[in-house]
Protein backbone atom coordinates (compact mmCIF):
# COMPACT_ATOMS: atom_id res chain seq x y z
CA UNK A 1 0.00 0.00 0.00
CA UNK A 2 1.35 3.41 -0.89
CA UNK A 3 0.81 6.37 1.41
CA UNK A 4 0.93 10.09 0.88
CA UNK A 5 4.10 12.13 1.32
CA UNK A 6 4.15 15.89 1.18
CA UNK A 7 6.24 17.78 -1.33
CA UNK A 8 6.61 21.46 -2.26
CA UNK A 9 3.62 22.97 -4.04
CA UNK A 10 5.63 23.82 -7.15
CA UNK A 11 6.38 20.11 -7.65
CA UNK A 12 2.77 19.10 -7.01
CA UNK A 13 1.46 21.54 -9.61
CA UNK A 14 3.37 19.71 -12.34
CA UNK A 15 2.04 16.25 -11.47
CA UNK A 16 -1.11 14.76 -13.06
CA UNK A 17 -4.19 14.61 -10.84
CA UNK A 18 -6.01 11.38 -9.96
CA UNK A 19 -9.73 11.24 -9.14
CA UNK A 20 -10.86 9.67 -5.85
CA UNK A 21 -13.87 7.35 -6.25
CA UNK A 22 -15.19 8.23 -2.79
CA UNK A 23 -15.18 12.03 -2.66
CA UNK A 24 -14.75 12.58 -6.43
CA UNK A 25 -11.97 15.07 -5.70
CA UNK A 26 -8.76 15.24 -7.69
CA UNK A 27 -5.40 14.78 -5.98
CA UNK A 28 -1.80 14.08 -6.83
CA UNK A 29 -0.56 10.50 -6.74
CA UNK A 30 1.29 11.13 -3.48
CA UNK A 31 -1.97 12.18 -1.82
CA UNK A 32 -3.56 8.87 -2.75
CA UNK A 33 -3.42 5.40 -1.21
CA UNK A 34 -3.41 2.20 -3.27
CA UNK A 35 -4.83 -1.03 -1.84
CA UNK A 36 -2.22 -3.72 -2.46
CA UNK A 37 -4.62 -6.61 -3.06
CA UNK A 38 -6.74 -5.01 -5.79
CA UNK A 39 -4.74 -1.91 -6.80
CA UNK A 40 -7.78 0.35 -6.34
CA UNK A 41 -6.73 3.90 -5.48
CA UNK A 42 -8.41 6.46 -3.20
CA UNK A 43 -7.37 9.66 -1.50
CA UNK A 44 -5.70 8.89 1.81
CA UNK A 45 -8.13 10.99 3.87
CA UNK A 46 -11.24 9.25 2.48
CA UNK A 47 -9.81 5.77 2.92
CA UNK A 48 -8.73 6.58 6.48
CA UNK A 49 -12.21 7.82 7.38
CA UNK A 50 -13.78 4.75 5.75
CA UNK A 51 -11.59 2.34 7.73
CA UNK A 52 -12.10 4.19 11.03
CA UNK A 53 -15.88 4.25 10.56
CA UNK A 54 -16.06 0.48 9.98
CA UNK A 55 -13.91 -0.24 13.03
CA UNK A 56 -15.83 2.13 15.32
CA UNK A 57 -19.18 0.65 14.24
CA UNK A 58 -17.90 -2.90 14.71
CA UNK A 59 -17.13 -4.72 11.51
CA UNK A 60 -18.33 -8.28 10.95
CA UNK A 61 -15.87 -9.28 8.24
CA UNK A 62 -12.55 -8.12 6.88
CA UNK A 63 -12.41 -4.53 5.65
CA UNK A 64 -13.12 -4.70 1.94
CA UNK A 65 -12.29 -2.26 -0.82
CA UNK A 66 -14.77 0.64 -0.66
CA UNK A 67 -15.36 0.39 -4.41
CA UNK A 68 -18.54 -1.69 -4.79
CA UNK A 69 -17.55 -2.59 -8.36
CA UNK A 70 -14.01 -3.65 -7.49
CA UNK A 71 -13.21 -6.48 -9.96
CA UNK A 72 -10.89 -8.31 -7.54
CA UNK A 73 -13.04 -7.68 -4.43
CA UNK A 74 -9.89 -6.77 -2.54
CA UNK A 75 -9.44 -6.41 1.22
CA UNK A 76 -7.12 -4.24 3.26
CA UNK A 77 -4.37 -6.14 5.03
CA UNK A 78 -3.64 -5.61 8.71
CA UNK A 79 -0.39 -3.75 8.05
CA UNK A 80 -2.23 -1.38 5.68
CA UNK A 81 -4.84 -0.61 8.33
CA UNK A 82 -2.17 -0.10 10.99
CA UNK A 83 -0.45 2.54 8.86
CA UNK A 84 -3.70 4.46 8.58
CA UNK A 85 -5.41 4.58 11.99
CA UNK A 86 -4.48 5.56 15.52
CA UNK A 87 -3.17 3.01 18.03
CA UNK A 88 -6.40 2.81 20.06
CA UNK A 89 -8.50 2.21 16.93
CA UNK A 90 -6.08 -0.48 15.79
CA UNK A 91 -6.37 -2.13 19.19
CA UNK A 92 -10.16 -2.20 18.82
CA UNK A 93 -9.78 -3.69 15.33
CA UNK A 94 -7.63 -6.54 16.68
CA UNK A 95 -10.15 -7.13 19.46
CA UNK A 96 -12.99 -7.34 16.93
CA UNK A 97 -11.00 -9.76 14.80
CA UNK A 98 -10.32 -11.95 17.84
CA UNK A 99 -14.01 -11.95 18.82
CA UNK A 100 -14.94 -12.97 15.28
CA UNK A 101 -12.35 -15.75 15.37
CA UNK A 102 -13.82 -17.15 18.60
CA UNK A 103 -17.35 -16.88 17.21
CA UNK A 104 -16.44 -18.96 14.15
CA UNK A 105 -14.37 -21.54 16.03
CA UNK A 106 -16.56 -24.54 17.02
CA UNK A 107 -13.98 -25.65 19.60
CA UNK A 108 -13.92 -22.38 21.55
CA UNK A 109 -16.59 -20.28 23.26
CA UNK A 110 -16.86 -17.37 25.66
CA UNK A 111 -17.50 -17.83 29.36
CA UNK A 112 -21.08 -16.54 29.89
CA UNK A 113 -20.21 -14.78 33.15
CA UNK A 114 -20.23 -11.02 32.60
CA UNK A 115 -17.52 -10.62 35.24
CA UNK A 116 -15.21 -13.09 33.48
CA UNK A 117 -15.62 -13.34 29.68
CA UNK A 118 -12.68 -15.72 29.32
CA UNK A 119 -12.29 -18.05 26.34
CA UNK A 120 -13.14 -21.69 27.10
CA UNK A 121 -12.15 -24.75 25.08
CA UNK A 122 -14.62 -27.46 24.10
CA UNK A 123 -13.90 -31.12 23.57
CA UNK A 124 -13.56 -31.90 19.86
CA UNK A 125 -15.24 -35.29 20.34
CA UNK A 126 -19.01 -34.84 20.18
CA UNK A 127 -18.70 -31.14 19.41
CA UNK A 128 -22.16 -31.12 17.79
CA UNK A 129 -23.84 -32.14 21.07
CA UNK A 130 -24.27 -30.07 24.26
CA UNK A 131 -21.37 -30.71 26.63
CA UNK A 132 -20.14 -29.61 30.02
CA UNK A 133 -17.69 -26.72 29.87
CA UNK A 134 -15.75 -25.49 32.89
CA UNK A 135 -14.15 -22.06 32.72
CA UNK A 136 -10.51 -22.20 33.76
CA UNK A 137 -10.66 -18.61 35.02
CA UNK A 138 -13.79 -18.55 37.23
CA UNK A 139 -14.52 -22.33 37.49
CA UNK A 140 -18.15 -21.91 36.46
CA UNK A 141 -19.74 -24.95 34.76
CA UNK A 142 -22.12 -24.27 31.89
CA UNK A 143 -23.72 -25.89 28.85
CA UNK A 144 -21.90 -25.36 25.56
CA UNK A 145 -25.17 -25.04 23.63
CA UNK A 146 -27.38 -22.70 25.67
CA UNK A 147 -24.73 -21.22 28.02
CA UNK A 148 -26.96 -21.94 31.03
CA UNK A 149 -25.76 -23.67 34.19
CA UNK A 150 -24.92 -27.27 33.36
CA UNK A 151 -28.10 -29.38 33.28
CA UNK A 152 -27.18 -33.11 32.99
CA UNK A 153 -29.93 -35.32 31.62
CA UNK A 154 -32.11 -32.36 30.63
CA UNK A 155 -32.63 -30.59 27.34
CA UNK A 156 -31.64 -26.97 26.86
CA UNK A 157 -34.42 -24.62 28.05
CA UNK A 158 -36.28 -22.98 25.19
CA UNK A 159 -36.48 -19.68 27.04
CA UNK A 160 -32.71 -19.36 27.26
CA UNK A 161 -32.38 -17.47 23.97
CA UNK A 162 -31.74 -14.25 25.92
CA UNK A 163 -29.96 -14.52 29.23
CA UNK A 164 -27.66 -12.67 31.55
CA UNK A 165 -25.32 -14.36 33.98
CA UNK A 166 -24.20 -12.24 36.95
CA UNK A 167 -20.92 -12.70 38.76
CA UNK A 168 -22.39 -15.14 41.32
CA UNK A 169 -21.88 -18.55 39.71
CA UNK A 170 -24.40 -20.24 42.02
CA UNK A 171 -27.34 -18.27 40.65
CA UNK A 172 -29.21 -19.00 37.45
CA UNK A 173 -29.40 -16.72 34.43
CA UNK A 174 -31.47 -13.58 34.75
CA UNK A 175 -33.43 -12.27 31.83
CA UNK A 176 -35.64 -9.39 30.86
CA UNK A 177 -34.24 -7.03 33.50
CA UNK A 178 -33.97 -3.35 32.69
CA UNK A 179 -30.78 -2.68 34.64
CA UNK A 180 -28.54 -5.48 33.36
CA UNK A 181 -25.77 -4.21 31.04
CA UNK A 182 -25.38 -7.41 29.00
CA UNK A 183 -27.99 -9.51 27.21
CA UNK A 184 -27.95 -11.97 24.34
CA UNK A 185 -29.25 -11.42 20.82
CA UNK A 186 -32.54 -13.33 20.43
CA UNK A 187 -31.50 -14.53 16.99
CA UNK A 188 -27.80 -15.50 17.08
CA UNK A 189 -27.28 -15.67 20.88
CA UNK A 190 -24.24 -13.38 20.80
CA UNK A 191 -23.72 -11.25 23.92
CA UNK A 192 -24.46 -7.54 23.50
CA UNK A 193 -23.49 -4.79 25.92
CA UNK A 194 -25.55 -1.62 26.19
CA UNK A 195 -23.86 1.37 27.74
CA UNK A 196 -26.58 3.98 27.35
CA UNK A 197 -28.85 5.61 24.82
CA UNK A 198 -31.54 4.17 22.58
CA UNK A 199 -33.41 0.99 23.54
CA UNK A 200 -33.68 -0.05 19.90
CA UNK A 201 -30.73 -2.43 19.55
CA UNK A 202 -29.16 -3.95 16.45
CA UNK A 203 -26.91 -6.99 16.73
CA UNK A 204 -23.64 -6.36 14.90
CA UNK A 205 -23.29 -10.06 14.20
CA UNK A 206 -26.63 -10.87 12.51
CA UNK A 207 -28.13 -7.35 12.05
CA UNK A 208 -31.27 -8.31 13.98
CA UNK A 209 -33.12 -5.32 15.51
CA UNK A 210 -34.88 -5.81 18.84
CA UNK A 211 -36.07 -4.01 21.96
CA UNK A 212 -33.56 -4.04 24.81
CA UNK A 213 -36.23 -4.33 27.51
CA UNK A 214 -38.65 -7.00 26.26
CA UNK A 215 -36.43 -8.46 23.47
CA UNK A 216 -39.25 -8.26 20.92
CA UNK A 217 -38.21 -8.06 17.27
CA UNK A 218 -38.17 -4.57 15.70
CA UNK A 219 -37.08 -5.65 12.22
CA UNK A 220 -40.39 -4.54 10.66
CA UNK A 221 -41.22 -1.73 13.08
CA UNK A 222 -39.95 1.20 11.00
CA UNK A 223 -42.09 3.73 12.89
CA UNK A 224 -41.15 2.39 16.36
CA UNK A 225 -44.81 1.85 17.29
CA UNK A 226 -43.61 -0.70 19.85
CA UNK A 227 -42.73 2.11 22.27
CA UNK A 228 -46.22 3.64 22.18
CA UNK A 229 -47.91 0.89 24.16
CA UNK A 230 -47.32 -2.00 26.53
CA UNK A 231 -44.59 -2.32 29.19
CA UNK A 232 -42.01 -0.57 26.97
CA UNK A 233 -44.11 2.57 26.53
CA UNK A 234 -41.93 5.72 26.45
CA UNK A 235 -38.77 3.69 27.11
CA UNK A 236 -37.10 4.30 23.76
CA UNK A 237 -34.65 6.77 25.29
CA UNK A 238 -35.43 9.67 22.94
CA UNK A 239 -37.68 12.69 23.32
CA UNK A 240 -41.16 12.64 21.84
CA UNK A 241 -40.13 15.30 19.34
CA UNK A 242 -37.24 13.20 18.01
CA UNK A 243 -39.54 10.18 17.63
CA UNK A 244 -42.07 12.25 15.68
CA UNK A 245 -39.27 13.60 13.47
CA UNK A 246 -38.05 10.04 12.81
CA UNK A 247 -41.54 8.92 11.82
CA UNK A 248 -41.96 11.97 9.59
CA UNK A 249 -38.75 11.08 7.76
CA UNK A 250 -39.79 7.44 7.29
CA UNK A 251 -43.26 8.40 6.04
CA UNK A 252 -41.68 11.01 3.75
CA UNK A 253 -39.37 8.42 2.19
CA UNK A 254 -42.22 6.00 1.48
CA UNK A 255 -44.47 8.81 0.23
CA UNK A 256 -41.73 10.11 -2.06
CA UNK A 257 -41.15 6.66 -3.50
CA UNK A 258 -44.89 6.20 -4.08
CA UNK A 259 -45.16 9.64 -5.71
CA UNK A 260 -42.24 8.81 -7.98
CA UNK A 261 -43.98 5.63 -9.13
CA UNK A 262 -47.23 7.53 -9.65
CA UNK A 263 -45.54 10.19 -11.79
CA UNK A 264 -43.52 7.67 -13.78
CA UNK A 265 -46.40 5.24 -14.45
CA UNK A 266 -47.93 7.21 -17.42
CA UNK A 267 -44.54 7.37 -19.12
CA UNK A 268 -44.06 3.66 -18.57
CA UNK A 269 -47.48 2.93 -20.08
CA UNK A 270 -46.70 5.11 -23.11
CA UNK A 271 -43.28 3.58 -23.60
CA UNK A 272 -44.46 -0.04 -23.36
CA UNK A 273 -46.06 -0.23 -26.89
CA UNK A 274 -42.93 1.21 -28.50
CA UNK A 275 -40.70 -1.27 -26.69
CA UNK A 276 -42.93 -4.19 -27.70
CA UNK A 277 -43.10 -2.93 -31.29
CA UNK A 278 -39.31 -2.65 -31.55
CA UNK A 279 -38.94 -6.10 -30.06
CA UNK A 280 -41.42 -7.59 -32.57
CA UNK A 281 -39.57 -5.97 -35.48
CA UNK A 282 -36.29 -7.39 -34.25
CA UNK A 283 -37.80 -10.86 -33.93
CA UNK A 284 -39.36 -10.60 -37.41
CA UNK A 285 -36.04 -9.54 -38.90
CA UNK A 286 -34.33 -12.55 -37.35
CA UNK A 287 -36.96 -14.90 -38.80
CA UNK A 288 -36.69 -13.58 -42.40
CA UNK A 289 -34.62 -15.86 -44.66
CA UNK A 290 -31.40 -14.47 -46.08
CA UNK A 291 -31.59 -13.40 -49.78
CA UNK A 292 -29.96 -15.76 -52.27
Curated annotation (Swiss-Prot):
Q: Where are the transmembrane segments?
A: 250-270
The protein, known as: Probable E3 ubiquitin-protein ligase RNF144A
Q: Which GO terms describe its molecular function?
A: ubiquitin-protein transferase activity; zinc ion binding
The record's comment on protein family reads: Belongs to the RBR family. RNF144 subfamily.
Which EC class heads this enzyme's classification?
transferase
How is the protein disposed in the membrane?
A: Single-pass membrane protein
- Keywords assigned by UniProt? Membrane, Metal-binding, Repeat, Transferase, Transmembrane, Transmembrane helix, Ubl conjugation pathway, Zinc, Zinc-finger
> What species is this protein from?
Xenopus tropicalis
Give the EC number: 2.3.2.31
Amino acid sequence: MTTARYRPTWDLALEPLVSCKLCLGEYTVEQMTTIAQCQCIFCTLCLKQYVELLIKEGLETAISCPDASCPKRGHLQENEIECMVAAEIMQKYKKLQFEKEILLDPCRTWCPSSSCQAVCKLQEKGIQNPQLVQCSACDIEFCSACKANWHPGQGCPENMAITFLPGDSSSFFKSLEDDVPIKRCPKCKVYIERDEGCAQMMCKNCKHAFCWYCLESLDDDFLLIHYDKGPCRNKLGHSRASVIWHRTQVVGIFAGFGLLLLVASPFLLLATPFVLCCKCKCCKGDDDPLPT
